[in-house]
């Protein structure tokens, strides 16, 4: 065994064979390489020559080295080398105490920790010493030394805990154990975290025993803490124990069902703490129920989010119109300031006709009406329905409300109001009374300085007290609420600005709004349907655990011994209430392993005189197969070289070798530039041009003649379009559907040439995507002359069928005479090209409704994604600048060329305007023109 | 280190590629021959008038008819001018005959990576090309020991055919040197081969061929490897045609001595050739065939000019 290297041999004796290497060297050295056989006609001339130095040339040194290396490899391989062989732990001299940090920080390397502990327990068994495996989570339980075998069994039953244990309690147990069994050997497998007690614990066990071994993994521990759902996004603090190790990573956000919603990267940049940000839409952010650091299996690297972390969307309507001029006088200002930290506020656009409805359409969960007196009929109904469906309506009083009357209030209001402490009154402004037990505000401190000088009064109906959430010191309600359907109506009897009360200036205002907002999830869940006005306890006294995390960060049923948390508990997890969800589903509270402001710090144990051992992470590696493979490769190389030297390796000519070198170079150098390209994917100028100018495009078939005719045809059509319509298309372009981006072109003309090979699968897929996204492809089989109705398909038709195999083509029908495509610009019957006999196929229209109102033009919901014709349209369009057809037409004539162009114009107009022409607006004109 | 190989026996046989190669070379050579003509401006080729009556095309003289002669020989147009009968005589014209021999021994099938083609290919192409060139110039060409002198246009095909027939019939290896039959006076011989045999045998062969006064040209086709001996290291040389092997521990040690011996071998052959007023041209397969053809043509022309002078001398 070599002390400096973690290398061991199974059969070290075999290594003695290495001594034979020099002998082999000499043998190989004097054995010349096989002579090169060389036919030589003038051999006669050589006979009888006696050159001065005719000793055979020796094996070159590098070949010798190669062979020796191969043999050495074989010998070493036979000796059974093992890298990182498991070393036996030192045998303890006294009873062994294995202290195991089993908090969540130990979870990522738990298996290695357990293996290290097992190794020591094995050693203890061999030296017949009693042992004890003491998990830190066990606390101050008394340590009993048992047979190492039993201790091993116990060790195997241990699992990491989701919370960090209390080491000091363990140290007390150790001290008492040491009192019974003096001089124990202590092995401490630490997670390396200093959670407040590492130093003291170390000192205490150092005092107990002189033989303390500490095994630490040296692993950096990562954790999540303090996620906050802020307006801009969800932020979570990422912590690590040491400013070392990988600085970048990914935090994953999962929803309640465990589906991945988003990933956010973080970068420590040398610090020990950083923040990961999820900038997602608020609906998605509210779905997040669990954050975890990717690749870190521990409860600390998991952060659970509950209802409290969700952001609500609040619609805010205020009666003021000129809010912006003097913001401090506007109620919306105070509300926005108070709500912004935990909710998203939506305000209706100033121009909105009905702000209430537009906000309700925006899916607000809470509506706040700040001093809105009269709600119009429609908006009233919408609001009532909103509340019935579980929404929360919060209203603030004010002059408008005081003078108006509607039923969207929790209690009947007295007209007018009450002024306290004014010039005409005799009472001082009233303070708030403490909140009653039934109020959701119960527990909030009531500051002294909050006074109410004016309010609206509720009629003292029976049941008013139950509806009261907050009241003045004289008992008059200030905040009343009533259930209505599944929702809730809350009324603040004061304004949301400071004119009636200074409540909006106090922190209480924020707390009260927060409580109300927290209620919204509950009401929208519709968990219970209590009748309006019935008093209900808004919070249970304590929350039972529903699902808890284990040490590895997996949610599961809570283990026995977990106690419920009191209502309103907001501290970090503790052994008696591990991280997890507490409370009934839908209203559960998440407890996390780390408190919101907690940090991680690594413990330092310098100067204690502990023997430190690394936690072996890598297992033993058997080097034998690798060495044998190396020897084999070396021998193969030797064979090739020998062949080459004796000239029997023809193909290993210099040219081939140079080619190989070039190939290797290309392989090595190849990826670099390509990755650079992907980094900066610029928009090609061609795409830029296509995006800026609408232009016709055609698929280059590869047949030069057809492509040229197609180009000419599209140029002619573009010319006609520019002359006759408001569309001025750019120059037509040829595209390759496999390579080019198609989304810039509304219309793609695809002439079919049966002799060309099929485009690759990618091209068909892209064409299909193009059609799905609203593009139109005109396939032109150009075989109207050859095709016979009912006859066998022409080669072009077969080609097209092959192409469209696997493409989602809608149902097609021959172009019906009333199709909108025949009416979009000109009134035409068919798309005519070079031939007139072919039929154009287009996406089938929905059938004519049975009531049979005859309409001159019919259209589907969208533009047909595919049109198949066989008339060779482009050849029919192609003309010289003076308008003369370039190609002879069948049957021919100036008129046919014109009709062909009109068909082309209609086609382009159809793809650009869709079903616009089937609108009834044009029906009269169309009818008139059809009558002629 | 260059590599070398022997052609398979089958692959070495005369075939279409040699005909094609020869014709192409001869075609190409026509362009080259413009340059060659300037060098040999005074040399004419073709049919050479012998300044005496005989078989020929051009008019020589009228002579009185001698009774006993065939009546068909009377030139009636001339005879009609007076009462006597005349016979039209033509100048005796005779073409030179060039005997070509192409060595096809085993050693000719040698080819190295430095060579453009195997020696035998080069020799066959050269031989057939010179035959074509000669026939087109009006001379007659014969394959030594295989064909009579021919002047047909398809001389390349005829020669190739004759070679193929011999190869098909021959059971043993072709000889490294031609049979020592004396060539007629005035004829020329073109011997193409690698001439690796002992100089004494070559000398005897030349003497045998020129025993009746024929002149000749040796074209020695060699592979660049044979000239430069670029071998290194442990090499085993295998004889070609001649049995035997030689294992050289360090081939490079042989180089200087080999080159000296090769030069001596050449010098011996050249001496033997010069003794009979023959010429020796060394051609390397690493060079294009046109070089050898040009050199050979120039030598043939100068030789035939000399021959003509020699023939005219006794007349004048």
List the model feature ranges, each with a label.
Chain B
Residues 2-51, 59, 64-72, 78, ...:
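Exposed, interaction-prone extracellular/peripheral surfaces
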């Amino acid at each position: 065994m070599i002390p400096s290297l973690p290398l061991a041999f199974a059969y070290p004796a075999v290594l003695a064979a290495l001594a034979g290497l020099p002998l082999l060297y000499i043998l190989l050295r004097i054995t010349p390489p096989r002579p090169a056989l060389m036919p030589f006609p003038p051999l006669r001339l050589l006979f009888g020559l006696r050159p001065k130095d005719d000793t055979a040339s020796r094996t070159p040194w590098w070949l010798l080295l190669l062979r020796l290396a191969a043999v050495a490899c074989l010998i070493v391989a036979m000796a059974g080398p093992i890298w990182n062989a498991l070393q036996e732990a030192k045998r303890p001299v006294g009873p062994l105490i294995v202290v195991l940090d089993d908090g969540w920080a130990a979870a990522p390397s738990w298996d290695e920790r357990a293996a290290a502990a097992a190794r020591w327990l094995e050693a203890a068994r061999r030296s017949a010493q009693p042992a004890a495996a003491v998990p830190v989570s066990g606390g101050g339980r008394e340590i009993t030394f048992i047979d190492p075998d039993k201790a091993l069994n116990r060790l195997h039953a241990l699992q990491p805990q989701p919370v960090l244990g209390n080491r000091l309690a363990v140290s007390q147990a150790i001290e008492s154990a040491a009192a019974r069994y003096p001089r124990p050997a202590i092995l401490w497998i630490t997670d390396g975290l200093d959670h407040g007690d590492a130093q003291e614990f170390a000192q205490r066990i150092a005092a107990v025993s002189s033989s303390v071994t500490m095994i630490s993994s040296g692993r950096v521990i990562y954790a999540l803490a303090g996620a906050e759902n802020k307006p801009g996004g969800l932020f979570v603090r990422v912590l690590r124990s040491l400013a070392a190790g990988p600085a970048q990573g990914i935090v994953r956000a999962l929803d309640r069902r465990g589906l991945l919603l988003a990933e956010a990267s973080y970068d420590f940049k040398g610090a020990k703490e950083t923040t990961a940000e999820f900038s997602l839409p608020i609906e998605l952010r509210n779905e997040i129920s669990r954050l975890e650091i990717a690749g870190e299996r521990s409860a600390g690297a998991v952060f659970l989010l509950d209802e409290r972390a969700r952001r609500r969307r609040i619609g805010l309507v205020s009666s003021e119109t000129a809010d912006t001029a003097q913001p401090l006088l506007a109620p919306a200002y105070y509300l926005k300031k108070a709500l912004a930290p935990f909710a998203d506020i939506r305000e209706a656009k100033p121009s909105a006709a009905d702000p209430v409805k537009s906000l309700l359409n925006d899916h607000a969960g809470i509506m706040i009406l700040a001093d809105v007196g009269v709600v119009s009929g429609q908006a009233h109904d919408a609001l009532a329905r909103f509340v019935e469906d579980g929404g929360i309506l919060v209203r603030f009083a004010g002059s408008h409300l005081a003078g108006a009357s509607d039923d969207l209030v929790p209690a009947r209001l007295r007209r007018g109001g009450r002024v306290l402490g004014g010039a005409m009154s005799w009472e001082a402004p009233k303070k708030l009374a403490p909140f009653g037990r039934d109020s959701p505000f119960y527990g909030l401190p009531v500051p002294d300085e909050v006074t109410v000088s004016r309010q609206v009064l509720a009629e003292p109906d029976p049941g008013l007290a139950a509806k009261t959430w907050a009241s003045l010191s004289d008992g008059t309600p200030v905040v009343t609420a009533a259930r209505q359907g599944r929702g809730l109506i809350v009324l603040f009897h004061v304004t949301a600005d400071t004119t009636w009360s200074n409540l909006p200036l106090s922190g209480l205002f924020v707390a009260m709004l927060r409580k109300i907002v927290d209620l919204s999830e509950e009401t929208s869940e519709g968990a219970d349907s209590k009748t309006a006005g019935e008093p209900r306890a808004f919070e249970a006294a304590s929350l039972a655990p529903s699902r808890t995390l284990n040490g590895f960060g997996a949610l599961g049923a809570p283990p026995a011994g977990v106690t419920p948390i009191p209502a309103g508990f907001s501290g970090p997890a503790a052994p008696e209430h591990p991280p997890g969800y507490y409370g009934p589903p839908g209203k559960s509270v998440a407890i996390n392993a780390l408190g919101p402001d907690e940090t991680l710090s690594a413990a330092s144990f310098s100067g204690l005189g502990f023997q430190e051992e690394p936690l072996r992470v890598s297992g033993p590696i058997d080097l034998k197969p690798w060495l044998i493979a190396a020897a084999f490769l070396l021998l193969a190389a030797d064979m090739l070289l020998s062949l080459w030297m004796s000239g029997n390796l023809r193909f290993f000519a210099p040219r081939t070798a140079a080619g190989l070198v070039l190939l290797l170079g290309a392989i090595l150098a190849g990826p670099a530039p390509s990755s650079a390209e992907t980094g900066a994917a610029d928009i090609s100028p061609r795409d830029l041009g296509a995006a800026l100018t609408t232009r016709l495009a055609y698929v280059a078939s590869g047949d030069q003649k057809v492509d040229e005719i197609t180009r000419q045809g599209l140029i002619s059509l573009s010319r006609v379009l520019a002359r006759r319509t408001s569309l001025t298309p750019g120059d037509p372009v040829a595209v390759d559907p496999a390579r080019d981006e198609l989304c810039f072109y509304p219309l793609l003309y695809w002439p079919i040439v049966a002799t060309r090979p099929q485009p690759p699968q990618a091209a068909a897929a892209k064409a299909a995507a193009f059609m799905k996204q609203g593009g139109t492809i005109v396939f032109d089989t150009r075989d109207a002359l050859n095709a016979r109705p009912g006859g066998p398909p022409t080669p072009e038709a077969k080609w097209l069928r092959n192409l469209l195999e696997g493409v989602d083509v809608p149902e097609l029908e021959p172009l019906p005479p009333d199709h909108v495509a025949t009416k979009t610009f000109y009134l035409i019957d068919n798309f005519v090209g070079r031939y007139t006999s072919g039929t154009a196929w287009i996406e089938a229209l929905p059938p004519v409704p049975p009531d049979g109102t005859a309409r001159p033009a019919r259209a589907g919901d969208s533009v047909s994604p595919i049109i198949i014709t066989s008339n060779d349209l482009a050849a029919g369009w192609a003309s010289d600048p003076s308008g003369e057809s370039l190609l002879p037409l069948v049957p021919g004539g100036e008129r046919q060329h014109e009709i062909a162009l009109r068909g082309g114009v209609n086609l382009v107009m159809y793809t650009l305007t869709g079903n616009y022409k089937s609108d009834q607006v044009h029906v009269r004109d169309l009818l008139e023109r059809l009558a002629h | 280190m260059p590599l070398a190989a022997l052609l398979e026996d089958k692959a070495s046989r005369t075939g279409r590629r040699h005909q094609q190669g020869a014709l192409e070379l001869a075609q190409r050579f026509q362009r080259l021959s413009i340059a060659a003509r300037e060098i040999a401006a005074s040399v004419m080729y073709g049919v050479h008038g012998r300044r005496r009556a005989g078989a020929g095309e051009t008019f020589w003289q009228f002579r009185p008819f001698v009774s006993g002669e065939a009546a068909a020989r009377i030139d009636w147009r001339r005879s009609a001018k007076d009462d006597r009968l005349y016979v039209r005589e033509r100048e005796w014209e005779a073409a030179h005959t060039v005997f070509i021999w192409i060595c096809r021994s085993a050693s000719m099938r040698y080819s190295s990576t430095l060579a453009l083609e195997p020696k035998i290919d080069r020799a066959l192409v050269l031989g057939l090309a010179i035959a074509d060139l000669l026939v087109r110039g009006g001379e007659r060409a014969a394959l030594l020991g295989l064909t009579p002198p021919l002047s047909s246009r398809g001389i390349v095909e005829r020669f190739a055919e004759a070679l193929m027939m011999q190869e098909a019939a021959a059971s043993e290896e072709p000889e490294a040197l031609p049979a020592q039959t004396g060539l007629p006076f005035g004829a020329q011989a073109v011997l193409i081969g690698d001439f690796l045999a002992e100089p004494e045998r070559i000398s005897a062969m030349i003497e045998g061929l020129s025993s009746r006064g024929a002149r000749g040209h040796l074209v020695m086709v060699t592979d660049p490897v044979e000239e430069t001996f670029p071998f290194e290291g442990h090499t085993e040389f295998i004889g070609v045609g001649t049995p035997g092997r030689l294992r050289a521990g360090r081939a490079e040690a042989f180089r200087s001595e080999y080159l000296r011996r090769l030069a001596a071998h050449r010098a011996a052959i050249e001496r033997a050739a010069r003794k009979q007023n023959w010429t020796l041209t060394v051609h390397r397969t690493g060079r294009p065939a046109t070089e050898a053809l040009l050199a050979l043509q120039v030598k043939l022309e100068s030789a035939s000019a000399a021959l003509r002078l020699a023939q005219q001398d006794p007349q004048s």
